[in-house]
C-alpha cells in the first residue's frame, strides 16, 4: 500500500513538473519585466533587430507617430510579449509576418498568442503613438534619456539588458 502511494506521489510530481506555465502569457504579463519573463525571452528569442521610424511633427502639440519592425528568431512557437508602457489606444496596428494579427494590450505589454508565431525568423510590425513621458520636446529639438527599463515608454520592445539587438533608426523631421 505504501509503495502505491509513493509511486502515485512521484507520478503526480513528475506530471506537474512537465507542465510549462511559464509559456502562458497570463503568468508572465505583470507590469514591468519580471525575472520569469526576462528568462523566458532570453531562452526563446535571438537574432533581434529593430527597425524604428518616428515622424516628428512641426507643432509640439501634435503627437509623434512611430512604427517599429522587430525581427527575431525562435526555435519553436512561443507567445510574443513585447513591452510597451502606454495606453491601449496608443497601439494603432500590429502585423506579424506581413499580416494583421490579433493581439492584446495588458499590464504594459503587447501580447501575441503563440499560435501566430512560426519557428525560424518572424517579423512583427507595430504602428504606435509613443507616450510623452520619455520625449523631451522643445521648440528647436527633441531628446530622450532612456535609462534602463524606460525604452518601453517610447516604443514596443524587449526592454531587458540581456537581449542585445541591432537598431536602424529613421526620423521624419520638419
Question: Residue ranges of each PLM-predicted region?
Answer:
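Positively charged n-region of N-terminal signal peptides that target proteins for export
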Residues: 1-4
